[in-house]
Amino acid sequence: TKKKALMQQQLGGFFRTELTKAFGPEPEPATLPIDRAYLKTANLSAVAFTECTVTDFHEGEHKGRRFSAANVELRRTVEEKSGPDNDNWMTRTETLFRGIVVRCKDICDPALDIALNDMFQERKKDDITDPAAFRKYFAAHTADGREVNDLVTPQLRDLVQKLEASSGSAKLCGLILRDGDLTLALNTRYVFAGIPEELDLRDIDGIRKWFTASLTGMGNLLDLITESPALTGAAE
């Protein structure tokens, strides 16, 4: 957007400095890309997407652990019959996911192989403590597609709840623990390394504060993930 270009022009230097201060220099090329090709193979959404937008991708280190993150939107086009006699086809675009995708390297037990996907059921935040309820809202699979609901430990359920409690608008879309790495797709209004649309461009101080806070927010999220006992693979 024009607004974004203008902001980059004015504050690009500040943004880069803050990012490097928070997460170190950006590797070239990226070792943990978040792009269309990766999102297609990762299957973070239970419903396949046809279009995606990735913005503010950054890779770096937090407390010695390599990670990458980006703001992502996944959409699909749906064809529906419409008109008085249902004889017209109408195409509409549906947003499947809007939030952040985070990849963490060498963060969990390499023996773990589990992918959790939100099943797109309506639910309230507090519905997922109970194993039976959790099963209704999330499907668990291995890399080769086997269903592994029994491998969902209390620790893993607890991690999902903590992720959803991390911000008022957070809702898990997908979480993958595989080959020692973790990938997270979290629906949220939180914007990583960026600022929300509605911020006034003339408020330079406000933009700076917001940007820095978004980096701190990512650090907190990474701490929450790293500290989870779910990553060691040991059930109680």
Segments (PLM) and residue ranges:
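Charged, low-complexity intrinsically disordered regions
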Residues: 17, 21-23, 29-75, 80-84, ...
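Alpha-helical transmembrane spans
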Residues: 1-5
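GGW-centered surface loops in extracellular recognition modules
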Residues: 9
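Nuclease catalytic cores
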Residues: 12
